[in-house]
């Protein structure tokens, strides 16, 4: 019986991994000079109904300089990542180099449209683009690369050619903004690398120009949180992207890197977000306060704030502080509250980031529950130019060497609330006096209601068991309440072969049941 269970588990593993590879991206080229309907990754039955009504000739005839500009933006925003250009190598060596390679499935616009729409070899279907956007980028590739640099592969468009294309009466839907990375409900926190900047006064984004290897940029004055936990502070639905006030906790250095307000959260520039390579997300909006890159808490053994971490050749320091100094434990997500847990020396700390408002002025708050320490703790809150106040007991507030300093007292514990605002906000002490007292944050570490109680069903397309290797295709729930993109990246199984857990590159985690069900129906529940 145990052997049968293990065989079933192995089969399910092969089925799931094969399905995920098929659904995520195809990584092998098909060595074929001709194309039939089975060579494309996406069958005709999976295409949108609009595809059968497209006026291909009408779209192609309308291509112009504006189409070239739009197509260039699409290519340099998306396609360049894999294909590269004449100066920069793409990330996939086998991806077609339009300026020198022989195209496997035709160079006329309609043949290229089939490749872009349905996928072929290592080229996944680009169904997120409208038909006109697909033809725009094809126009850019044909005119900019093939016609100019690879003329042997260029095929002209004639009246005879256009008359032979499939007939239709639609140009497809109008182009709409496409930003699924910011549409998704990630929840009220999001862990990433961030640069904190003010939209009006911050430094302009800079990358070294030219082909790789790029020379080092000078980021010595930039405020990066490499292990940043961004937390939404204002109430409301939609997760962190729908908020209008945030703070970032840097768990390398146990510092709050800053707080900002605005619309949009970040600019979403990152390979795992909007697919842009060699970049990082920046905050967007008004930066109300920030702290310099460096330890927030003094070394409990020496009282020094000197940063001991690895220094790279460009002068920046990376990595966490030594564990004896500070150690990030994790976080608790209770309702809409995010409780961050870490240790400084022998002292355990729970921290909750939030906000207060007074006469339209936002005040950023930090609640800290600090256990008794074996040595007196000292924390840099913010540079002295900002307004800072405190309520609660067990610590004192002062200024030292250009910073507001929180100094722990020799008592059993501290339970305090810090208030931080822009320079010149004189009412901050009044806000602190009238605000609710600091809470016992341990209450929010005991678990709470499920954040994602919904269950979603999808189907299994069963393969042929007569062959040596059977593949069943599992359909992820692309249509889900949180607009998760379902970019599945990992899977693990339970002892019960009917159950699996999968994670996605966007951070969502799913519990899957029904793997051995005869109904060929899967049930998905988001658990993180």
Residue ranges and their predicted role:
Residues 33, 50-58, 65, 76, ...:
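Flexible coil segments in periplasmic/lumen-exposed cytochrome c-class electron-transfer proteins
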Residues 385-387, 392-450:
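Extended acidic/polar, glycine-enriched regions
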Residues 65, 72, 84-114:
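Gly/Gly-Pro-rich "capping" loops immediately C-terminal to redox-active cysteine motifs
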Residues 457-462, 474-476, 498-528:
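Beta-propeller domains
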